[in-house]
Amino acid sequence: THPETYSGKRVLVIGGGNTAIDAARTAVRENADSVTLVYRRSEDAMPATQQERSIAKAEGVQLKTLRSPARFVGENGTLTGLECNIMQLTAPDYPGGRPNSAPTGETETLEADLVVLALGFENLPVAGVNTDPHNHIIIGKDFSTSVDKVYAGGDAVTGAATFMKAVAAGKDAAAAIFARLC
């Protein structure tokens, strides 16, 4: 990153995962005037770990939960804020799942000079590769999928996790592929 990107700015980071936390903490370190993480559910429902959330808050990141971005607000071609729908928690899609959120009909505009999108991902369907109900790829102990010579690891298998876990899974999958080739 370039320090001038964040320095002196009111930064909003949209997202609730560890990537969003990393982006927010980076903005704090790069001397942003304020950094607020905007998430559509409650703090407890964030996919980011409790440890990551605690560290971010200790470093000065503010959390604005139960807010879902609706539109950017600007003046003379310059961003001035983000209008958010105020949300309320609703039942999860499945037992043990994170709660969903629905708009209350109210809105709030958060001031911002810079907005960072740190939103999740969705696995793309791959022909013949079996997935679980959460669309995570099902693998064997050797990282093999249901398609011969196709291997998977990282977030595509576990869902959102840490960078280090994804790197470790990549190394393990590479070792399994190498073992199969030899």
Language model feature labels by segment:
Residues H2-A32:
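Rossmann-like NAD(P)H-binding beta-loop-alpha module
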Residues V13-I14, C84, L117:
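Redox-cofactor binding/interface segments in oxidoreductases and associated redox assembly factors
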